[in-house]
Amino acid sequence: MKPLVSIICITYNQAEYLSSCLDSIFSQQVDFQVELIIHDDASTDSTTEIISQYIKKCPFQIKTILQKENQYSKGIDIFSKYIYPKVEGKYIAICEGDDYWTDSRKLSIQIKMLEANQSFSATAHQSTVIYEKENREHLFCLLRKNIIKMDDVMGNRIFHTASFVFRSDIIPLLSIDIIPFAYDRFLFLVCSFYGDIYYFYDNMCVYRKSEIGITSHITYQIHKRDLFVPKKLKEINSNFPYYRYMAYVNKA
């Protein structure tokens, strides 16, 4: 039976945190089929060993993509090239290896909303941001509305990737030659082109800010990738306000 939801976990040198991430995924209480797709971008720590251990106890179908060379540093769109082709679910949830979900009902809550409302392209929710070295935390964003539109996501990150669940039929629109540094903003905007995003006030995940991770070593060349994003967005949606978006980016 095909899964209803494909959970994507991308990781790089996150052995210290990966167990918390995978445990939170495995703890989801659902009455539908789920698959887990793990992409490791050539970690040099014990991340791959931890993945091997969890494969043995995964309660649902699991697919692994274990790179021999780091793809992110080459600017390769790992989602379109490696991950999305393996997706079988109607919906996609993402949780990076150093983040984790805190509510076992998270997927059920979000999928129920999407199944009942075809006009929504995605759902998101509140998150907690934890600063590992500073021993402090805060809410990701004090958002006070449920219906999120393109203008809402154009200038600000109002929810975190670990809170996001979107329809997989949007995948063909997400292919981009060079993966942007701010891939989440690109993803949120494309989803907002094709329907509103429903936002839950419930706090159901943790975004861990640490020096370890996929974006821990950002160079000027990596930042330059985002210059390709506005043109791609304009290709997808001819009504996309290119110059207004660039004004937001230049202020950021």
Residue ranges and their predicted role:
Residues 92:
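Short aromatic/hydrophobic "clamp" motif used to bind/position activated sugar donors
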Residues 3-6, 35, 186:
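Cell-envelope/extracellular polymer assembly enzymes that use nucleotide-activated donors
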Residues 23-33:
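Short, acidic, metal-binding catalytic loop of nucleotide-sugar glycosyltransferases
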Residues 105-138:
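Conserved donor NDP-sugar-binding/catalytic core segment of glycosyltransferases
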Residues 40-49, 69, 96:
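A conserved acidic beta->alpha catalytic loop
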Residues 67-88, 109:
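Glycine-rich, basic loop-to-helix element that forms the pyrophosphate-binding segment
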Residues 19, 45-54:
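Acidic helix N-cap motif at the loop->helix transition within catalytic regions
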Residues 85, 125, 141-221:
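Conserved nucleotide-sugar donor-binding catalytic segment
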